[in-house]
């Protein structure tokens, strides 16, 4: 890594001896590492000097992804503390529901994923909010792969009923779900659309505290509006 850091300071390239000196490595060790880095594509030798190779882009992309995930996690943790409820962030990617990050506390635990979120989008607020943002063909395709099934006595019973509900919601309307995924839990989700990517922020509370859901959702909408740019970064995660 020290050799790569040294090479990065020389856009026009630097010879092996200079890189070894700047990295604080013995020349034989540096030669061995430089050959390896050149073979792996992290460095490229041109006219006697070493320059950064194409593979270093993967390193920077990985670091950028890690930073984005950290920003999302920090944002959700802040909202969890501020609102006093678990907070979820999910996107619809490659035809599947992807819960990117969840923030909760001991006093406000997240919903237990007792049935795979990806397969039960018809039953929870996250899935319903994401499906509402899709066009009719994409919704039907999703339901063909993940059919509606009962999880609780409150779960929607069939595709037709669900599709009517989604049509009535509209793409950018909040979704409230009352014990359809898990008994004892009520949830709300708000849509966050960036470009063509469907995304959602969601919260959950015990059904005994259902009165908290509406004010908590309103506060989440306000906070999401303030930090929409932060959420936009996470779409590429």
How should these model regions be labeled?
Residues 151-152, 183:
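Intrinsically disordered, low-complexity polar/acidic regions
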Residues 42-45, 89-90, 192:
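A structural signal for short hydrophobic beta-strand segments in well-ordered beta-sheet cores
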Residues 158-226:
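Extended hydrophobic
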Residues 147, 225-237:
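Cysteine/selenocysteine-centered motifs that mediate thiol-based redox chemistry or coordinate metal-sulfur cofactors
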Residues 1-66, 228-229, 233:
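N-terminal helix-turn-helix
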Residues 51-145:
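Amphipathic alpha-helical effector-binding/dimerization core
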């Amino acid at each position: 890594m020290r050799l790569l850091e040294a090479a990065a300071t020389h856009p026009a390239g630097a010879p092996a001896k200079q890189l070894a000196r700047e990295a604080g490595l013995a020349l034989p060790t540096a030669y061995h590492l430089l050959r390896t880095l050149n073979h792996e594509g992290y460095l490229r030798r041109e006219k006697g000097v070493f320059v950064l190779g194409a593979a270093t882009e993967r390193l920077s992309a990985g670091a950028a992804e890690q930073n984005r995930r950290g920003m999302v996690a920090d944002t959700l943790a802040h909202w969890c503390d501020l609102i006093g409820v678990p907070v979820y962030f999910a996107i619809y990617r490659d035809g599947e529901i992807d819960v990117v990050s969840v923030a909760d506390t001991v006093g406000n635990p997240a919903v237990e994923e007792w049935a795979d979120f990806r397969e039960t989008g018809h039953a929870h607020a996250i899935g319903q909010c994401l499906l509402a943002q899709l066009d009719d063909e994409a919704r039907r395709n999703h339901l063909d792969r993940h059919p509606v099934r009962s999880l609780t006595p409150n779960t929607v019973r069939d595709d037709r009923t669900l599709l009517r509900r989604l049509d009535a919601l509209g793409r950018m309307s909040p979704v409230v779900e009352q014990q359809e995924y898990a008994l004892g839990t009520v949830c709300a989700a708000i849509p966050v659309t960036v470009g063509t990517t469907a995304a959602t922020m969601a919260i959950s509370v015990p059904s005994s505290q259902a009165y908290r859901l509406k004010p908590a959702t309103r506060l989440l909408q306000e906070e999401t509006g303030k930090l929409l740019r932060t959420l936009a970064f996470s779409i590429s995660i």
